[in-house]
């Protein structure tokens, strides 16, 4: 059984849907070297609601949130003033990534989702 992490309002869902549309444009603009992932915190077991270039990590819509994204979420929740800054990471095959995790705030000022951007450093 899928246990919700948070309950989303209709407005929260509308906010996340607007980000999903933005991902299409960002993906077209930035190109194949970028993986863009939109997470909804309504269900951590199926948090990925939109993904562009998921072939780099093998993720798809309906995939669960990663341990790293959960760690970043915890840091963002503990320190709301924390600025978003890029960091380096590796995917499962060991390829170097430059990543950024951006919190998405909903109707009541709480974090309802995450926008994760991963640039694959070995991309042409």
Name each model-derived stretch.
Residues 25-85, 90-92:
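Structured interaction and signal-relay segments at domain junctions
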């Amino acid at each position: 059984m899928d246990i919700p992490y948070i309950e989303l309002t209709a407005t929260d869902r509308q906010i996340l849907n607007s980000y999903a549309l933005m991902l299409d444009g960002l993906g077209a603009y930035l190109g194949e070297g970028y993986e863009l992932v939109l997470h909804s915190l309504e269900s951590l077991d199926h948090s990925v609601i939109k993904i562009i270039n998921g072939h780099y990590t093998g993720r798809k819509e309906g995939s669960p949130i990663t341990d790293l994204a959960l760690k970043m979420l915890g840091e963002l929740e503990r320190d709301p003033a924390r600025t978003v800054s890029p960091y380096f990471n590796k995917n499962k095959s060991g390829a170097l990534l430059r990543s950024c995790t951006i919190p998405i705030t909903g109707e009541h000022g709480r974090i309802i989702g995450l926008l994760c951007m991963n640039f694959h450093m070995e991309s042409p």
